[in-house]
């Protein structure tokens, strides 16, 4: 047929374009523009449009057998099994499972498709309307295979990369890597072949075996392209520039070396002065080690002034001080460190306390006490400031930590001595009370009042107070030495050691005072019950018998410690006194006053007749019982 009014008329034998009824199959409207062949392959709608244009412009072939009147999708989808059709529908609707398809959604899609269907027609210019490129890409149905129908189709995810695209990208990356490797290998081979003509050993060593077999060595050469010669002016200018750069570099190096030399010289002077001060003030007997200052965060030298290495068990103070170099004053500072995390450094007010012994004597008429003795400061240098002398500061710190440990051990021992007249007034004072006397051990600050008390006139018991204080300090040293000896000996017991057993500070002093009072009372009882009644009777105090030392050690250090500790055996031994009362021809009464814990009194009485035969041998703990027993002996056996 011929064109009519600018429009192309189609032959009936070749078929006419029709619009498929969407009720034939429940697919999206965009799928209507695409045709699916019987073998499952897809044909783009754009290609059909192109073929229709070619039909309108070219003569139409009269062959009705080669062209089908209607390409019906129902022939493919209608006869498709459900196990293939359902996954296809789910994929086209972006659904993950068949249960997500509801009747309301299907009705809504049908209504939207009925409103949005566009029939393909001819425009006034004879062209056929075509869809967008993006729409055409969506109209291509996928090829249906058995593997795809059996597998569960997952919903499309725009952010995820398909496996095929990922494999394609992987292949491209590998191709680029192989290409770069080949190019670098080719460059290396080229350089090796070029180098083999100049330096054969180096070139042949870097050539690959394939290149050695394929190309002879030294077969590639290169020529040097000479630069145009410079004239005299350019040569002179270049020489001047080179010399200028060299001179400038030399001047910069000179200035840099001079600056660094000045810094090193200054640092060397500071270090020399620092170590000179340390060697001047620190002796070989001081324990010096490295530690980090928690206040400055720098590593510094520290001095250990505590007595832990000497056997001390005092844990309240580490006994460590940091040597800090004050750059402003150019001097060393000794700063003690506390165990507490809150307080890093100990102030002078908290450490400068020393022990003082006060002796008060009771006034019988007024029932009051008067100060009759006070210990003095044995080292007068403690009262003088020593901010610049590190050795004196170390000596002061050693003295004060020893005094604090002494008070700590006194308070620890006084807990078990409260039944015998020992009590606390505050954390810095321990009081020992005895008949007619009161002894106070107090930690007092080192201030002007301590200095003024040293100039007061001497009292009656000042010497006795000093002796008691010296005795306490010596006994603390004995405790340290016993701890050292225990550390040198092998452990023979699995039981945990208790230091309370060797804590003998107040007990020897209190034991001597109480034993003296007990002895006076016993003498008074014997005088009243025996001497005043029996004529010609007398009493005498027998000399004490010395006990031989039974400690022998083969090891030299242990033997030396035993010898040093043995010097205090007489003080540490429990007090014991023997009294002999002579009754003339009636016999002898021997009384032995001893103690089991330094503080109590045990009285042993032995009465022997004139023939030396022991008549009574008994022990008393009460003076009233002793008095009654002496009355019994005198009345029954003497008179």
Curated annotation (Swiss-Prot):
Q: List the disulfide bonds.
A: none
Q: Which InterPro entries match?
A: Mediator_Med17
Q: Where does this polypeptide localize?
A: Nucleus
Q: Which GO terms describe its molecular function?
A: DNA-binding transcription factor binding; RNA polymerase II complex recruiting activity; RNA polymerase II core promoter sequence-specific DNA binding; transcription coregulator activity
Q: Does the keyword Signal apply?
A: no
Residue ranges, compositional bias (Polar residues):
32-43, 58-68
What are the record's GO terms for cellular component? core mediator complex; mediator complex
Report which residue ranges the record marks as coiled coil.
Answer: 245-271
Q: Write out the biased-composition intervals (Low complexity).
A: 48-57
Q: Which domain of life is it from?
A: Eukaryota
Q: Which UniProt keywords apply?
A: Activator, Coiled coil, Nucleus, Transcription, Transcription regulation
- What Gene Ontology biological process does one annotation of this record name? positive regulation of transcription elongation by RNA polymerase II
Region annotation (Disordered) ranges = 32-68, 130-159
- Pfam families to which the protein is assigned, alphabetical: Med17
Listed under subunit, the entry gives:
Component of the Mediator complex.
Family per UniProt?
Answer: Belongs to the Mediator complex subunit 17 family.
The free-text function statement in the UniProt record for this protein reads: Component of the Mediator complex, a coactivator involved in the regulated transcription of nearly all RNA polymerase II-dependent genes. Mediator functions as a bridge to convey information from gene-specific regulatory proteins to the basal RNA polymerase II transcription machinery. Mediator is recruited to promoters by direct interactions with regulatory proteins and serves as a scaffold for the assembly of a functional preinitiation complex with RNA polymerase II and the general transcription factors.
What name has this protein been given in UniProt?
Answer: Mediator of RNA polymerase II transcription subunit 17
- Record the organism: Eremothecium gossypii (strain ATCC 10895 / CBS 109.51 / FGSC 9923 / NRRL Y-1056)
């Amino acid at each position: 047929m011929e064109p009519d009014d600018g429009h192309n008329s189609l032959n009936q034998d070749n078929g006419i374009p029709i619009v498929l009824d969407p009720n034939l199959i429940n697919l999206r409207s965009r799928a209507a523009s695409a045709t699916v062949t019987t073998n499952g392959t897809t044909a783009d709608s754009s290609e059909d449009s192109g073929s229709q244009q070619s039909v309108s412009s070219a003569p139409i072939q009269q062959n009705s057998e080669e062209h089908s009147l209607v390409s019906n999708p129902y022939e493919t989808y209608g006869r498709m099994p459900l196990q293939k059709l359902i996954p296809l529908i789910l994929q086209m609707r972006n659904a993950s499972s068949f249960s997500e398809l509801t009747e309301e959604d299907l009705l809504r899609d049908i209504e939207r498709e009925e409103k949005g269907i566009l029939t393909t027609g001819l425009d006034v210019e004879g062209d056929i309307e075509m869809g967008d490129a993006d729409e055409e890409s969506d109209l291509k149905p996928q090829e249906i295979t058995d593997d795809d129908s059996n597998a569960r189709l997952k919903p499309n995810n725009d952010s995820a990369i398909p496996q095929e695209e990922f494999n394609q990208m992987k292949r491209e990356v590998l191709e680029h890597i192989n290409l770069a490797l080949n190019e670098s290998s080719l460059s290396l081979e080229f350089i090796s072949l070029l180098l083999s003509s100049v330096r054969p050993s180096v070139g042949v060593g870097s050539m690959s075996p394939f290149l050695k077999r394929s190309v002879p060595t030294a077969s590639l050469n290169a020529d040097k392209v000479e630069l145009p010669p410079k004239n005299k002016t350019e040569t002179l200018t270049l020489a001047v520039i080179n010399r200028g750069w060299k001179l400038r570099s030399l001047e910069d190096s000179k200035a840099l070396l001079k600056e660094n030399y000045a810094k090193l010289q200054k640092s060397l002077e500071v270090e020399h002065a620092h170590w000179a001060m340390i060697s001047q003030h620190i002796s070989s007997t001081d324990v010096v080690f490295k530690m980090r200052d928690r206040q400055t965060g720098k590593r510094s030298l520290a001095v250990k002034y505590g007595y832990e290495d000497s056997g001390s068990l005092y844990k309240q103070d580490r006994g460590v001080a940091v040597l800090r170099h004050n750059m402003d004053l150019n001097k060393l500072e000794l700063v003690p460190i506390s165990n507490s995390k809150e307080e890093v450094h100990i102030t002078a007010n908290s450490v400068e306390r020393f022990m003082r012994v006060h002796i008060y004597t009771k006034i019988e008429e007024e029932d009051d006490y008067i100060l009759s003795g006070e210990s003095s400061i044995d080292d007068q240098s403690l009262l003088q400031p020593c901010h610049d002398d590190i050795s004196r500061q170390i000596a002061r710190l050693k003295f004060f930590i020893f005094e604090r440990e002494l008070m700590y051990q006194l308070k620890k021992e006084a807990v078990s001595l409260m039944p015998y007249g020992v009590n606390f007034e505050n954390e810095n004072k321990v009081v020992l009370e005895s008949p007619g006397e009161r002894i106070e051990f107090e930690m007092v600050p080192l201030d002007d009042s301590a200095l003024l008390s040293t100039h007061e006139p001497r009292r009656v018991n000042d010497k006795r107070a000093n002796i008691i204080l010296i005795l306490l300090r010596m006994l603390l040293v004995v405790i340290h030495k016993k701890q050292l000896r225990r550390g040198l000996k092998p452990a023979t017991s699995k039981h945990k050691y208790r230091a309370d057993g060797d804590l003998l500070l107040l007990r020897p002093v209190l034991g001597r005072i109480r034993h003296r009072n007990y002895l006076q009372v016993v003498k008074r009882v014997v005088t009243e019950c025996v001497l005043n009644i029996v004529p010609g009777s007398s009493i005498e105090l027998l000399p004490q018998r010395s006990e031989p030392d039974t400690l022998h050690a083969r090891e030299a250090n242990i033997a030396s410690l035993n010898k040093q500790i043995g010097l205090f055996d007489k003080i540490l031994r429990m007090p014991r006194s023997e009294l002999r009362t002579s009754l003339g021809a009636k016999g002898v009464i021997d009384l032995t006053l001893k103690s089991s814990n330094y503080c109590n009194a045990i009285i042993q009485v032995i009465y022997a007749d004139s023939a030396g035969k022991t008549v009574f041998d008994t022990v008393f703990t009460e003076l009233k019982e002793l008095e009654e027993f002496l009355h019994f002996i005198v009345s029954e056996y003497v008179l």
